[in-house]
Amino acid sequence: MRLILLGPPGAGKGTQAAFLTQHYGIPQISTGDMLRAAVKAGTPLGLEAKKVMDAGGLVSDDLIIGLVRDRLTQPDCANGYLFDGFPRTIPQADALKSAGIALDYVVEIEVPESDIIERMSERRVHPASGRSYHVRFNPPKAEGVDDVTGEPLVQRDDDREETVRHRLNVYQNQTRPLVDYYSSWAQSDAAAAPKYRKISGVGSVDEIKSRLSQALQS
């Protein structure tokens, strides 16, 4: 099973990715993790990436694709892989395609923007332990305080409404075009084209998991 999960921040991709990697016995491939590992290991590509990052530059798509190719040769990718946060742009998707990196499915998790803002802006965390709550869906026993310690809960900067709206704008401008890119490719009937599936990300974790499983069997 070789796939990409697409969807806006807050759509629940992380939760569903954890389920898929366990279910299919495949690794979750994050370009951030790959970069850190390559830099730490001092591989030729890692050293090249470190030079760029130390100078405050952005690592090129060619370099990222090189890292992806290296990563996919490792034994844990024998049954497939799940791309996490990659590709983010059309040039990256083109580079992935040109490199002949195979995909079986591209799944879009669709959630209305208003739901995402509500989901993320109502999250609260206990900083010391990392325990998280949701004002509406998973509230603490006593309002505003941690269940275990009774210490106050906080809202992370990332979860503030204005930050969430900014991240959604970035997604719409940069990553949302991938939805059209992959759905068009899937409809083209080209030999290497992945299947494109769209599911609703509204509902309980188990409901979404069930939709995802069905989509990957169709």
From Swiss-Prot:
Q: Where are the residues of the annotated region NMP?
A: 30-59
Q: Could you tell me where this protein is found in the cell?
A: Cytoplasm
Q: Where is this region: LID?
A: 122-159
* Keywords linked to the UniProt accession: ATP-binding, Cytoplasm, Kinase, Nucleotide biosynthesis, Nucleotide-binding, Transferase
Instruction: Spell out the PROSITE patterns in the cross-references.
Output: ADENYLATE_KINASE
Role, per record: Catalyzes the reversible transfer of the terminal phosphate group between ATP and AMP. Plays an important role in cellular energy homeostasis and in adenine nucleotide metabolism.
Similarity section: Belongs to the adenylate kinase family.
What is the protein name stated in its UniProt record?
A: Adenylate kinase
Q: What is the lineage of its organism?
A: Bacteria, Pseudomonadati, Pseudomonadota, Betaproteobacteria, Burkholderiales
